[in-house]
């Protein structure tokens, strides 16, 4: 299992949200690039980056911050937030982003999603952000009427191999991930599943590893020092 430390960027700085609410954001670090470098030094094999302003605006806003992360680290990064057309995907791949996460666009623009998966294959992941079991879009502000499993199956049929599942109610709470949701998703699709939201300690990571989850995104637990990234990576790699 891969542990992906998270960098959420708002107005050029690293922030953490609480249950996906933008008004409840707090700055945890001034420099996304320096934060990424520290994650690399701790042994991170992949870094999860979200352009929060982009998620709201529907276009990449913090491109300079993303570029700076790519320039200072050799660790591959995945990026989500506001990626809505193939030209942006191409641009991001060209500047060195390893994996692109489609969220709102995957739900609202099937033609673009199909084109992106066909063109870039393994470089495209689908982010499913769920609230009470239903897919949320537009920076989590709107909840659709599509069940997360139903949506995951559609995305798998379209050819995606990677799904990132976030339970919005758990995000930033340090109350543990939604293991039941993850298990149900595992039972219904054959994609690589990355867990996001609520991971609070090493025990959560061990349980996810035992479930054969592909990846675990950890944000607040690292910033609040509930999880030591270096130690966690070492423990998970040995299991």
UniProtKB/Swiss-Prot annotation:
One of its GO terms (biological process) is L-tryptophan biosynthetic process. GO terms for molecular function: 1-(5-phosphoribosyl)-5-[(5-phosphoribosylamino)methylideneamino]imidazole-4-carboxamide isomerase activity. Pathway: Amino-acid biosynthesis; L-histidine biosynthesis; L-histidine from 5-phospho-alpha-D-ribose 1-diphosphate: step 4/9. Its EC number is 5.3.1.16. Gene3D superfamilies: Aldolase class I. The active site is at 8 (proton acceptor), 129 (proton donor). It catalyses: 1-(5-phospho-beta-D-ribosyl)-5-[(5-phospho-beta-D-ribosylamino)methylideneamino]imidazole-4-carboxamide = 5-[(5-phospho-1-deoxy-D-ribulos-1-ylimino)methylamino]-1-(5-phospho-beta-D-ribosyl)imidazole-4-carboxamide. It is found in: Cytoplasm. The keyword Isomerase applies. Its main location: cytoplasm. The keyword Transmembrane does not apply. One of its GO terms (cellular component) is cytoplasm. CDD domains: HisA. Keywords: Amino-acid biosynthesis, Cytoplasm, Histidine biosynthesis, Isomerase. Belongs to the HisA/HisF family. This is 1-(5-phosphoribosyl)-5-[(5-phosphoribosylamino)methylideneamino] imidazole-4-carboxamide isomerase. The gene is hisA.
């Amino acid at each position: 299992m891969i542990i992906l430390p998270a960098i959420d960027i708002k107005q050029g700085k690293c922030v953490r949200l609480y249950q996906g609410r933008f008004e409840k954001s707090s700055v945890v670090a001034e420099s996304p690039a320096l934060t990424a470098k520290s994650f690399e030094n701790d042994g991170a094999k992949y870094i999860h980056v979200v352009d929060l302003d982009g998620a709201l605006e529907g276009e990449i806003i913090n491109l300079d911050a993303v570029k700076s992360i790519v320039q200072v680290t050799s660790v591959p990064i995945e990026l989500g937030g506001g990626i809505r057309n193939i030209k942006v995907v191409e641009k991001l791949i060209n500047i060195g982003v390893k994996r692109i996460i489609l969220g709102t666009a995957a739900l609202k623009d099937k033609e673009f999603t199909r084109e992106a998966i066909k063109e870039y294959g393994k470089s495209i992941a689908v982010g499913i952000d769920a609230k009470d079991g239903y897919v949320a879009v537009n920076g989590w502000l709107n909840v659709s009427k599509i069940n997360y499993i139903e949506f995951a199956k559609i995305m798998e049929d379209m050819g995606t191999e990677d799904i990132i599942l976030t339970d919005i109610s758990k995000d930033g709470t340090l109350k543990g991930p939604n293991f039941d949701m993850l298990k149900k998703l595992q039972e219904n699709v054959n994609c690589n599943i990355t867990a996001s939201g609520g991971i609070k300690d090493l025990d959560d990571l061990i349980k996810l590893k035992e479930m054969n989850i592909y990846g675990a995104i950890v944000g607040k637990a690292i910033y609040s020092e509930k999880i030591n990234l270096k130690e966690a990576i070492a423990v998970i790699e040995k299991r």
